[in-house]
Regions:
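Catalytic cores of nucleic-acid ligases and guanylyltransferases
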Residues: 1-210
């Protein structure tokens, strides 16, 4: 069977959308930096709604749901800011991810994704992520990014999702990005949810392609 690591499909970070309260409060002492035009415009990520079964049909795509921490990456003039769903700025907590994002050759971009740690089964584990943070050892922490909200001078939120993902895949395609990954998606198919859970995923996040 394929592991989550092998299929390299990051979830819509909506993996953190319905997390217990203690996840939201983890490391809550982190300082918040001054806002920029981009952090003000894209202040909070879009959250998912929990349903029992994923929708089907060619107009939908599906992403593996990670057991990690939702993050938004702001790339502005060579500087990188990683902001949690709760508004905490964490670039210093994940220097490897921050440094690799800084090598991306774009002047301005906003990426939406998930940060997590893979366990021995190749599935993300929130407890492993929490352990890495408590030990102040972020070497095993990786980032999976599934959406591109802004690129250069353009707000892409009204652009069809598939087009945004194509652009995101392009800017994350460099081989040196070993800790930063493009989060791919799956097409609708029978038993898709069962297959996702079979490889250790928490579930699926489904989105309309348009």
């Amino acid at each position: 069977d394929q592991t989550l690591n092998e299929i390299r499909a990051g979830a819509n970070g909506d993996a953190a959308d319905n997390v217990p309260e203690e996840k939201e409060k983890m490391q809550a002492s982190s300082a918040k930096l001054d806002d920029t035009p981009l952090t003000k415009k894209y202040a909070r990520p879009e959250l998912a709604t929990l349903v029992e079964f994923p929708p089907s049909g060619s107009e939908w795509l599906h992403e593996i749901k990670y057991d990690g921490y939702r993050i938004m990456a702001f790339l502005e003039d060579g500087k990188v800011r990683l902001r949690t769903r709760g508004g905490k700025d964490w670039p210093h907590k994940f220097p490897g991810i921050t440094d690799q994002l800084a090598t991306i050759n774009v002047s301005n971009a906003v990426l939406d994704g998930e940060i997590g740690v893979l366990n021995d089964r190749g599935a993300t584990s929130f407890s492993a992520l929490q352990d890495a943070l408590s030990r102040q050892d972020p070497s095993q922490v990786e980032g999976w990014f599934f959406d591109l909200l802004h690129l250069r001078d353009d707000d892409l939120t009204k652009t069809p999702l598939l087009e945004r993902k194509i652009a995101l895949k392009k800017i994350l395609s460099h081989k040196t990005l070993t800790l930063v990954h493009y989060s791919d998606h799956l097409e609708s198919s029978p038993h898709l949810l069962k297959k996702a859970c079979g490889i250790g995923a928490e579930g699926l996040v489904s989105k309309r392609k348009d």
